[in-house]
């Protein structure tokens, strides 16, 4: 059915849309600073509002699909203490949180390795990863 097909597409849509609020949270180049809206609301709330507003402009947009997309945006940081107003309650939201967290951790790891480029393979203990980190290959 079109409903089940629409729900299956939530994975793709939320992967593309989860940080859409950053387009209004941050000012454009060269400033790259937080806007007033960004400071007051943050990209999660801004993004949820954007999706809600866009869904209302599309005739017969399924309310359940809108709610699922908005939920994925609201829950993509995973925990209340990390800025999510909601914890993931859908499989799609859990998957998005795991992917977003993995992406952020890998970016952090890349930055750690780049900063310690002159060091040998073992970089020592890292509090964020709670582990002794070792460089492998060209990373």
Where do the PLM segments sit?
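Single conserved hydrophobic/aromatic residue that forms the stacking wall/gate
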Residues: 1-11
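Histidine- and acidic-residue-rich, metal-dependent catalytic cores
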Residues: 14-19, 41-80, 128-137
């Amino acid at each position: 059915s079109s409903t089940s097909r629409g729900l299956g597409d939530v994975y793709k849509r939320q992967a593309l849309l989860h940080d859409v609020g950053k387009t209004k949270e941050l000012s454009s180049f060269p400033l790259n600073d937080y806007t007033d809206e960004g400071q007051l609301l943050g990209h999660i709330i801004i993004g949820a509002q954007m999706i809600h507003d866009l869904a209302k402009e599309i005739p017969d947009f399924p309310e359940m699909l809108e709610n699922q997309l908005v939920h994925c945006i609201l829950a993509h940081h995973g925990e209340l203490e990390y800025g999510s107003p909601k914890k993931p309650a859908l499989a799609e939201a859990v998957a998005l949180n795991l992917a977003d967290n993995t992406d952020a951790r890998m970016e952090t790891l890349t930055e750690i390795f780049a900063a310690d480029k002159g060091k040998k393979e073992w970089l020592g203990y890292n509090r964020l990863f709670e582990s002794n980190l070792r460089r492998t290959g060209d990373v």
